[in-house]
């Protein structure tokens, strides 16, 4: 039976102050009426004399004694008088014994023979106990005399109580007398801090020291200290144990008295009185001075008492004794005592007269022991009334007795359960089998733990030596585990005892406080009552007052004693805690060494066996070669035999053998799941799965291994808790976790633990939900509720203080301070206080459990704050664990761990199925495109062949499980007409869900409406509606939208609707929510009076959603992108000729909208694709990684995309019979003064740019862009640079001439801008695009909307205010100005609060003060006076044409010379370039022209395009790149001039295709003007890189190669299987 750690609840419950009772928590203790028992014994005249000698004494616990007719004894143990777990009897000094004998001689009478027997031997008193019974009459004088002496003795003890040592004053359980001495369950011999653990269980020499030493020390005590001796009751006798020999005459007896005498030879119980007396005399003579175990009592020799007490507790052991072993039938007085048929447990104490052999045989039993009584809680056994088996004498030196006496130790540490009979080790060890558990138990009890673990044997040793080494290591490991278990049990018992004593002392201290308080109240009450009457105080009253005051002083002294003892116990617990840490450290080192040696030996043994087998095969092969040479073997037979041998050799490869060995040994040393550290388990599983991963390179694996080790290092450092965790260590752990998560290593338990240990993750997906945010949110909500409650102010302050303690605790952790024991105790008290106040924050409380904080009053009382840090570690509740210490190598467990941690390329089952379904679509794409659909009857035009093929593909996809895809045909192939054909070919049959939603840029909406009106027959009754704009362009309800067949809306308008629909409760929490919220969940947070957009109602489900120019949602963070992805629709389509323009992340936004699983989840997309294309120092991927990612992109696009270029052919013919397009690059170099100007500007700007880039201050990035802009302008014309600089100099800092009303007002407006608005300024600076005209911004001529942070051109401010003030969202302010909505985000800005970017830069980036601003104001006023006189106006007449102007004029002149009708489109990013070009076209060449720029309103733009088509004289169109690169059809022109290169090559291609599309009948010529040896060279290089990346993924030829891959190859590419 396993030994249970002892918890001693030491409670004094006696009339005498020197008696202790220790209750073990492993038993059920019945209430004991000790006083009643004492009274019975005294009334019966039972007095127990003790010898003057201080040697050990024999005693018997007797409740009631009688002699039956058959002269046998029977012990009747009443339930109400059950003996306690351990009775601490006081050891009497020589002085005490003499006084006691004098008293007893007076009491017992003058019988000569009997008195001599009592005086000469302690056996006499024992014999008298057997003779006394109820029938013996007692004289009244004797009773009176006895009672008087008892009272006198009690008074004497009470008088001496103040002189007794404070460490050994006992406490009556009812609070009558003094306190108890806490149990010292481990003595000084247990030195746990030794580096080399003594685990041999050999007794210390101090334990068997000569008792004469104690006698001498006792004789030297101060006799004056003890003035009274209490009457000895049955509890005063020393408890001793023995086993009983049985005789045949006792088998039928009914009554027994169990003698508990622990000595070498057990005496036989006498069958009659004389035999009893002689036996007692003989045994007393044998053990005199040796057998008694002294118990702590009222003595002043503290050092001696502590030594004896520690020795006693060291040998306490719970020893169950089966009742069936007794030869007598034991009965209870009360029938209910043994109703549960339990096992009787008897108290056992060690005897010091045992010889060395006997003690050794029982040493392991006595090492960790406690006194055990009869328990109703133990295992059920035979009933008491049914047991009549004879008692058999056990031989203490037999092997059976040894095995039965050694208690089983249940290990509470995380010791691995190693099956040393595992097949792998058995196979490696050969015929040398491992010893059985029974044999090992016998051998291990006497063996000594070896100091060091055997090292690895040489690789060339023989097989026999390897097997021998392995067997030795197995045995050593078994002994190591056993010894560690033993040592652990010792430590845990010590800690448990100290912990229990601390608990009791705390209870007693609280009781002492109450007693002092009650006594003080009583004393004050007496004083008050006597003072109230005004009469003289009588002597009786004075006695009462004095007695009350004395009682109060005594109670205060007792309280102080208890406090001192509690401090002493806590100090002991701290020492044990340090010993525990040292033990755990040494345990881990020893285990690791042992396991490593065991693994190496097993591997080497197998390797040796493999080498021997290979040598045998090679020898056979040589023999066959010799036989073939000699001609004794035919060639066919030789070939067959050598083939078999070669197959054996192939099967015996050492490399494979090593891998197999390691994998097979690992399950052997694997710990039970329930007892392993789940954090370490997660890390180990991640490493294991990474090792098995086939799609990662070795370099990547090594990097990830290093990051996993960083996390383990941080965890260990935090849990050690000895010092502050520095910022660098936390940063390393944070970066490692981020990189691992990005690389697909998903370990929820690890990341949650790191967050709880103070790591703050910027990516909310790593820990979702955010436990840290929930922690502080709970506290904030609790504060709010308490402040609004009706509780008293005192209660509110108390609760607030508790909440502050819990909040500060977590803040300390986030700062890098690990929790200390004192902090845990303080937070535990706060939690208990909150619970008592009724605050239910269960999640918060459970989160605190991770830091081992008690959350209930019971836990707070029971758990000492000094208990070891890593004791009782429990796994999280959501971890499904099945304890299995035997079979830990099952495949099911390995698979569950893979799914549990979601390591990269080991997807969850759902992701795997989704990827397989996606790969099925890859194989179907070829067959789908083979078909051809007919043109719908409701169309007014016939579809071209490639369009019919496209329509067939679109219809097939809608009939599949994908329900949508990407139509990425080249510009001009008719994506719009194919989409219209799809809407007509697959119209909805349900009137409730028939609406097609078409989202497009504003400039394209009119084109769509026109196409629908002209391409669809009227009989189709296909209704359309444009949502937005002025007039009746908006509806409020979904039912109004659902009436139309097609609803057209711009991206900007849809984003505004999403913004207005957003619940007010979630304002400011967008970043904490999913990027694509669920509409129904979102609407639950709205109130009835909020705005409901018809696009986002619960019933809003469109039949089909089409995104034209889908690249507009490429930024996943924009509101337009989120709005498009949130809308519900049955079918979802993206139309875009350039779905990828800058990075692979742009593709994710489209996948997210299409909801293609599993890559619609950002984590999955980044894991397999996105992360390999990021340029960051954190992500170190080689070319092979990127190639694999590109293959995945092609597979993905092949499954969801249809892309055809104009060069593609069908049946040998191109898709479109278009004339050719010729792209010419007209390269030139700067010369003369222009070259000097550019060179000087470049040198100056390079120096400034270097300085700015090295400066990390805000605003430096925009300054670098300005310098780069100047270089690009210089390539076009040097005058552009001058105009830009003059504009910058003349830029107004603020409108208005009043410093207070204008400048200072705007200054404060900027300083009060929200953080979100300031962040938006930085975002707008990155794009350098005006939100109104979409033109490129010029830093010297742009302003900031203070309400939202968007940037706008100075020239666009007036039209923006004019149009926006007419919108219904605009509001008129008190001053008459309008608060107008931003076109992009709908946030309001007062028209007078639009500030220049120059002022914003001065205030935010340069940190201007009011004084600086005033100085700038004065300088500005002077500049304005000068500028009024000298306003810079370019002198166009004196301007010389630049190289770019000359190139442009040459192209125009050549075109005009070759044709009288051909028209030209000229694209540029700089509208100021058009001003210079206009001068030369108008004045020098006299060529008419038109201009199309973003500052024009929609009507003006439309008029320009119509005039360009109709007027044959207007052959030149100047068009800005931003305003006209998409949405326009300009096939009336066939010449395109690109003046300056744009960052994005696809923007240029879109501009070119404005005229190269369907209906173009002329050859198209593209003229790209280029300046060599300038900044345009570097822009061209950037274009080339972007184009290579996109083309590598979008190349139709490479995408088609995917179709040649088999199913297995595709699965391998995505990590689903091996090749």
Swiss-Prot record:
Keywords: Activator, ATP-binding, Helicase, Hydrolase, Metal-binding, Nucleotide-binding, Nucleus, Phosphoprotein, Transcription, Transcription regulation, Ubl conjugation pathway, Zinc, Zinc-finger
Compositionally biased intervals (Polar residues): 86-102, 200-210, 242-259, 269-279
Keyword Transmembrane helix: no
Helicase C-terminal domain span: 1447-1606
GO molecular function: ATP binding; ATP-dependent activity, acting on DNA; helicase activity; hydrolase activity; SUMO binding; zinc ion binding
UniProt-listed Enzyme Commission number(s): 3.6.4.-
Residues reported to bind ATP: 969-976
InterPro entries in the record: Helicase_ATP-bd, Helicase_C-like, P-loop_NTPase, SNF2-like_sf, SNF2/RAD54-like_C, SNF2_N, SNF2_RAD54_helicase_TF, Znf_RING
Tagged with keyword Nucleus: yes
GO process annotations (BP): chromatin organization; double-strand break repair via homologous recombination; mating type switching
Positions carrying Phosphoserine: 121
Feature: compositional bias, Basic and acidic residues: 103-118, 211-226, 353-366
Residue span of region Disordered: 86-123, 200-279, 347-371, 429-450
Domain (Helicase ATP-binding): residue spans on this chain: 956-1157
Assembly description: Interacts with CDC3, CDC11, EBP2, SIR4, UBC4 and SUMO/SMT3.
Protein name (record): ATP-dependent helicase ULS1
Source organism of the structure: Saccharomyces cerevisiae (strain ATCC 204508 / S288c) (Baker's yeast)
The organism's taxonomic lineage, starting at the top: Eukaryota, Fungi, Dikarya, Ascomycota, Saccharomycotina
Gene that specifies this protein: ULS1
């Amino acid at each position: 039976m396993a030994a249970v750690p002892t918890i001693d609840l030491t409670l004094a419950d006696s009339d005498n102050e020197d008696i202790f009772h220790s209750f073990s928590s492993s038993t059920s203790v019945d209430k004991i009426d000790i006083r009643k028992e004492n009274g019975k014994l005294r009334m019966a005249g039972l007095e127990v004399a003790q010898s003057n000698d201080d040697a050990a004494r024999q005693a018997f616990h007797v409740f009631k004694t009688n002699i039956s007719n058959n002269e046998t004894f029977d012990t009747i143990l009443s339930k109400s008088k059950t003996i306690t777990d351990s009775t601490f009897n006081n050891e009497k000094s020589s002085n005490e014994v003499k006084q006691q004998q004098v008293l007893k001689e007076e009491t017992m009478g003058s019988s000569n023979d009997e008195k001599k027997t009592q005086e000469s031997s302690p056996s006499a008193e024992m014999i008298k106990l057997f003779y006394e019974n109820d029938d013996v009459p007692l004289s009244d004088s004797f009773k009176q005399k006895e009672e008087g002496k008892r009272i006198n003795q009690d008074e004497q003890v009470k008088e001496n109580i103040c002189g007794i040592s404070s460490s050994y004053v006992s406490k009556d359980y009812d609070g009558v007398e003094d306190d108890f001495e806490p149990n010292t369950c481990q003595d000084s011999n247990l030195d746990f801090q030794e580096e080399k653990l003594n685990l041999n269980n050999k007794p210390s020499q101090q334990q068997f020291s000569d008792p004469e030493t104690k006698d001498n020390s006792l004789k030297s005590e101060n006799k004056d200290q003890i003035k009274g001796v209490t009457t000895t009751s049955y509890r005063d006798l020393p408890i001793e144990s023995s086993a009983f020999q049985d005789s045949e005459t006792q088998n039928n007896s009914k009554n027994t008295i169990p003698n508990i005498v622990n000595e070498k030879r057990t005496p036989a119980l006498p069958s009659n009185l004389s035999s009893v007396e002689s036996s007692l005399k003989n045994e007393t003579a044998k053990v005199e001075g040796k057998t008694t175990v002294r118990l702590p009592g009222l003595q002043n020799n503290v050092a001696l008492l502590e030594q004896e007490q520690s020795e006693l507790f060291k040998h306490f052991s719970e020893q169950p004794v089966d009742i069936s072993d007794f030869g007598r039938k034991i009965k209870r007085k009360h029938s209910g005592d043994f109703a549960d048929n339990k096992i009787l447990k008897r108290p056992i104490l060690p005897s010091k007269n045992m010889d060395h052999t006997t003690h050794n045989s029982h040493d392991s039993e006595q090492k960790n022991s406690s006194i055990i009584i009869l328990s109703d809680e133990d295992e059920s056994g035979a009933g008491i009334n049914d047991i009549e088996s004879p008692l058999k004498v056990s031989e203490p030196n037999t092997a059976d007795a040894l095995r039965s006496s050694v208690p089983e130790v249940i290990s509470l540490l995380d010791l691995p359960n190693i099956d040393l009979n595992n097949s792998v080790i058995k196979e490696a060890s050969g015929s040398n089998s491992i010893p059985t558990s029974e044999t090992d138990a016998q051998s291990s009890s006497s063996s000594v733990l070896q100091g060091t673990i055997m090292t690895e044997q040489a690789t060339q040793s023989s097989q026999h030596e390897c097997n021998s080494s392995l067997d030795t290591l197995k045995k050593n490991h078994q002994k190591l585990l056993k010894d560690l278990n033993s040592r652990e049990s010792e430590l845990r018992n010590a800690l448990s005892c100290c912990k229990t004593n601390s608990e009791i002392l705390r209870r007693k201290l609280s009781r002492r406080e109450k007693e002092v308080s009650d006594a003080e109240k009583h004393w004050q009450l007496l004083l008050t009552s006597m003072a109230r009457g005004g009469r003289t105080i009588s002597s009786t009253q004075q006695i009462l007052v004095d007695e009350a005051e004395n009682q109060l002083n005594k109670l205060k002294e007792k309280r102080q004693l208890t406090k001192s003892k509690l401090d002493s116990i806590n100090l002991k617990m701290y020492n044990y805690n340090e010993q525990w840490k040292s033990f755990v450290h040494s345990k881990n080192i020893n285990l690791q060494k042992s396991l490593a040696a065991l693994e190496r030996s097993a591997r080497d043994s197998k390797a040796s066996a493999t080498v021997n087998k290979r040598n045998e095969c090679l020898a056979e092969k040589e023999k066959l070669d010799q036989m073939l040479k000699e001609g004794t073997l035919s060639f066919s037979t030789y070939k067959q035999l050598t083939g078999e041998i070669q197959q054996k050799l192939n099967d015996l490869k050492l490399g494979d053998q090593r891998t197999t060995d390691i994998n097979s040994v690992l399950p052997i040393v694997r710990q039970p799941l329930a007892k392993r550290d789940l954090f370490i388990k997660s890390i180990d599983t991640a490493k294991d799965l990474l090792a098995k991963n086939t799609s990662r390179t070795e370099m990547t694996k090594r990097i990830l291994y290093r990051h996993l080790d960083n996390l383990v290092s941080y965890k260990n450092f935090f849990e050690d808790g000895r010092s502050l965790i520095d910022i660098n260590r936390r940063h390393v752990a944070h970066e490692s976790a981020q990189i691992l998560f990005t690389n697909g290593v998903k370990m929820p338990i690890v990341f949650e633990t790191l967050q709880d240990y103070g790591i703050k993750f910027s990516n909310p997906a790593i820990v979702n939900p955010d436990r840290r945010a929930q922690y502080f949110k709970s506290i904030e909500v609790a504060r709010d509720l308490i402040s609004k409650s009706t509780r008293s102010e005192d209660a509110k302050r108390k609760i607030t203080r508790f909440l502050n303690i819990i909040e500060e605790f977590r803040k300390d952790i986030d700062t890098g301070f690990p929790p200390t024991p004192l902090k845990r105790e303080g937070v535990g008290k706060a939690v208990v206080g909150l619970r008592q106040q009724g605050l239910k924050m269960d999640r918060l409380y459970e989160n605190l459990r991770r830091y081992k904080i008690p959350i209930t009053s019971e836990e707070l009382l029971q758990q000492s704050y000094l208990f070891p840090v890593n004791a009782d570690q429990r796994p999280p509740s959501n971890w499904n664990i099945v304890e299995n210490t035997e079979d830990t190598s099952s495949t099911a467990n390995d698979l569950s761990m893979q799914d549990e941690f979601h390591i990269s390329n080991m997807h969850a089952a759902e992701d795997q199925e989704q990827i397989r379904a996606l790969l099925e679509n890859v194989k179907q794409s070829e067959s789908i495109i083979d078909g051809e659909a007919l043109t719908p009857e409701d169309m007014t035009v016939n579809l071209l062949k490639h369009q019919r093929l496209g329509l067939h593909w679109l219809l097939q996809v809608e009939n599949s499980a994908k329900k949508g895809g990407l139509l990425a045909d080249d510009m001009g192939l008719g994506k719009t007409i194919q989409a219209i054909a799809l809407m007509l070919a697959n119209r909805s049959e349900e009137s409730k869900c028939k609406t097609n939603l078409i989202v497009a840029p504003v400039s394209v909406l009119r084109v769509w409406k026109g196409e629908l009106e002209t391409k669809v027959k009227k009989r189709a009754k296909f209704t359309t509606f444009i949502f937005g704009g002025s007039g009746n362009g908006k509806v409020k309800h979904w039912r109004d939208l659902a009436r139309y067949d097609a609803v057209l809306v711009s991206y900007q308008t849809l984003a505004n609707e999403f913004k207005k629909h957003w619940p007010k409760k979630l304002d400011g929490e967008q970043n904490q929510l999913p990027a694509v919220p669920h509409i129904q969940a979102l609407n639950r947070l709205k109130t009835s009076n909020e705005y409901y957009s018809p696009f986002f109602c619960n019933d809003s489900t469109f039949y089909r959603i089409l995104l034209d120019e889908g690249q507009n949602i490429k930024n996943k963070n924009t509101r337009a992108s989120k709005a498009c992805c949130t809308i519900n629709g049955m079918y979802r389509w993206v139309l875009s000729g350039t779905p990828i323009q800058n990075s692979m992340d742009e593709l994710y936004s489209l996948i997210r909208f299409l909801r293609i699983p599993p890559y619609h989840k950002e984590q999955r997309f980044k894991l397999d694709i996105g992360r390999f294309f990021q340029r960051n120092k954190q992500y170190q991927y080689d070319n092979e990684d990127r190639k694999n990612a590109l293959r995945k992109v092609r597979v993905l696009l092949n499954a969801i995309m249809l892309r055809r270029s104009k060069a593609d052919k069908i049946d040998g013919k191109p898709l479109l019979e278009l004339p050719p397009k010729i792209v010419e690059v007209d390269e030139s170099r700067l010369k003369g003064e222009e070259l000097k100007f550019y060179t000087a500007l470049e040198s100056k700007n390079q120096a400034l740019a270097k300085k700015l880039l090295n400066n990390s201050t805000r605003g430096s990035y925009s300054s670098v862009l300005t310098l780069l802009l100047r270089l690009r302008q210089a390539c076009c014309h040097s005058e552009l640079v001058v105009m830009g600089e003059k504009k910058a100099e003349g830029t107004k800092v603020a409108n208005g001439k009043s410093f207070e009303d204008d400048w200072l007002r705007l200054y404060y407006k900027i300083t009060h801008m929200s953080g979100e608005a300031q962040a938006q300024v930085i975002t707008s600076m990155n794009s350098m695009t005006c939100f109104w005209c979409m033109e490129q911004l010029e830093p010297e001529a742009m302003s900031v909307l203070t309400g939202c942070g968007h940037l706008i051109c100075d020239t666009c401010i007036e039209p923006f205010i004019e149009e926006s003030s007419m919108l219904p969202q605009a509001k008129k302010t008190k001053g008459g100005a309008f608060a107008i909505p931003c076109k992009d985000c709908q946030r309001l800005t007062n028209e007078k609060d639009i500030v220049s970017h120059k002022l914003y830069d001065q205030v935010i980036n340069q940190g201007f003060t009011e004084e600086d601003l005033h100085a700038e104001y004065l300088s500005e006023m002077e500049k304005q006076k000068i500028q009024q006189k000298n306003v810079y106006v370019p002198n166009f007449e004196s301007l010389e044409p630049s190289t770019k102007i000359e190139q442009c004029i040459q192209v125009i002149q050549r075109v005009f010379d070759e044709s009288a009708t051909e028209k030209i489109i000229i694209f540029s990013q700089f509208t100021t370039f058009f001003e210079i070009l206009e001068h030369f076209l108008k004045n020098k060449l006299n060529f008419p022209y038109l201009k199309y720029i973003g500052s024009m309103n929609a009507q003006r733009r439309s008029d320009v395009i119509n005039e360009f088509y109709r007027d044959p004289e207007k052959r030149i169109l100047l068009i800005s790149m931003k305003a006209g690169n998409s949405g326009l059809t300009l096939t009336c022109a066939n010449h395109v001039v690109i003046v300056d290169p744009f960052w994005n090559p696809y923007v240029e291609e879109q501009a070119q295709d404005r005229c190269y599309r369907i209906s173009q009948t002329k050859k198209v010529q593209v003229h790209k003007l280029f300046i060599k040896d300038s900044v345009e060279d570097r822009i061209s290089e950037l274009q080339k890189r972007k184009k290579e990346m996109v083309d590598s993924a979008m190349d139709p030829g490479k995408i088609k190669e995917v179709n040649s891959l088999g199913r297995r190859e595709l699965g391998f590419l995505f990590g689903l299987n091996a090749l």
